[in-house]
Amino acid sequence: MQKRQLGNSGLEVSAIGLGCMGLSFGDGLATDKTAAIELIRRAHALGDIFFDTVEAYGPFVNEALLDEALAPFRDKVVIATKFGFAGGKVSDGVDSRPENIRAVAEASLRRLKTDVIDLFYQHRVDPAVPMEDVRAR
C-alpha cells in the first residue's frame, strides 16, 4: 500500500487508514469482538498502518480493542485518537478545556497500553474554549 507523510509531523501513514468507529459505536450494534480483531489484523496484513479511534467510540472500549488487535505489531502502526467530548461521550457535549485534554490523553494511553499517542487531535470544536488554549497544551 502506498504511504504518505502526514504534514510536517514526520509520521508516515498508509494512504488508506481504518476508521474504527463502526466496530463499537455508530448505527446498529457493535461488531463482535473476535470479528473486529480479525478485521483490524486483516487491514494491517493488507498494508494498512493507520488506525483512527477515540474514547467516545463505545464509549471507552474502542481504544482497548485496537490495543488488543495491534499489540503484536504496535511499533509498526500509527494510531490516532481524539479528545473533545465531555465525559468521553458524544451525548454529553463538547469539552476542550486543557484539563480535560490532559485527562483524555492519560486515559487513552492506559487503554491503548502505550506510552505514546502517535496522533492526538480535536474531534469537535468547543466554542467555549479559545483555540489558543486548546493548542497550547
Which ranges hold each PLM region?
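N-terminal binding-site loop/beta-alpha segment at the start of enzyme catalytic domains
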Residues: 1-78
